[in-house]
Curated annotation (Swiss-Prot):
It comes from the Bacteria. It is found in: Cytoplasm. This is DNA mismatch repair protein MutH. Keywords: Cytoplasm, DNA damage, DNA repair, Endonuclease, Hydrolase, Nuclease. Belongs to the MutH family. One of its GO terms (molecular function) is DNA binding. Sequence-specific endonuclease that cleaves unmethylated GATC sequences. It is involved in DNA mismatch repair. NCBIfam families: mutH_TIGR, PRK05070.1. The keyword DNA repair applies. Transmembrane segments: none annotated. GO terms for cellular component: cytoplasm. Pfam families: MutH (PF02976). It comes from Actinobacillus pleuropneumoniae serotype 5b (strain L20).
Length: 226
């Protein structure tokens, strides 16, 4: 299989993703001449970058989808031996300024989640990174119910941002979507607006999918008829 090449169609992309299933990260990294880190403590995004490279994705963390010409976003998801997600899934940065007039329909979150190619990967820490296996890909589009859940949470969380209630935001807000600091460290600051409408400095905030939500996606796939 020719990896790291442009996919002209959804079928072509899915063929590559299905071909990856069953290989270890080390085997794919070897094919791509990419070094495998001993652990992911300092290379948190390495697995995602490896799969992106293998499948020829281009966007990275930019607002557009990884396969914009196909309308598909790529997400790797670390799972345990029971197939349950080990961490929340980053979707996009939250707009802390210039957010007047943004609606769910025009939001980066909705754009990124319109169609997602999920790639489950073994993520338990006792398994050496190179020996972790890649799972079966899942091409997912949110159901009407799932989109409504996402919309409700997004609108609630954006209210906190638009009205400058940044100090009230915490990870318990939102049923399926949450807002959390997204930065390399506590010194990574960006512009925001407080309740008085004044420009202030804040930690960048990111929208994340809760583990229960992504677990439902994985479980629905396992239950679906082949």
């Amino acid at each position: 299989m020719q990896l790291s090449t442009f996919s002209h169609s959804e079928d072509e992309l899915l063929k590559k993703a299905n071909w990856l299933a069953g290989f270890t990260l080390g085997e794919i990294a070897h094919q791509l001449n990419i070094d495998v880190p001993l652990d992911l403590r300092r290379d948190k995004g390495w697995v995602g970058q490896l799969i992106e490279t293998a499948l020829g994705a281009k966007a990275g963390s930019k607002p557009e989808q990884d396969f914009a010409h196909l309308g598909i976003e790529l997400k790797t998801i670390p799972i345990n031996h029971k197939g349950f997600p080990l961490e929340t899934t980053f979707v996009s940065l939250a707009p802390l300024t210039q957010n007047t007039g943004i609606t769910w329909q025009t939001s980066h979150v909705r754009h990124k989640l319109q169609k997602v190619l999920w790639i489950p990967v073994q993520g338990e820490r006792h398994i050496p990174v190179a020996e972790r296996h890649i799972g079966q890909p899942i091409l997912w589009e949110p159901s009407c119910e799932q989109e409504q859940q996402l919309k409700n949470d997004w609108e609630e969380l954006m209210e906190y941002i638009i009205f400058g209630r940044l100090n009230e935001i915490n990870a318990t807000l939102g049923e399926v979507l949450q807002l959390r600091p997204k930065g390399r460290n506590r010194r990574s600051l960006t512009a925001a607006v407080n309740q008085q409408g004044e420009r202030v400095q804040s930690l960048p905030l990111g929208f994340y999918l809760r583990k229960q939500f992504t677990a439902e996606i994985l479980q629905n796939f396992l239950r679906s008829p082949l």
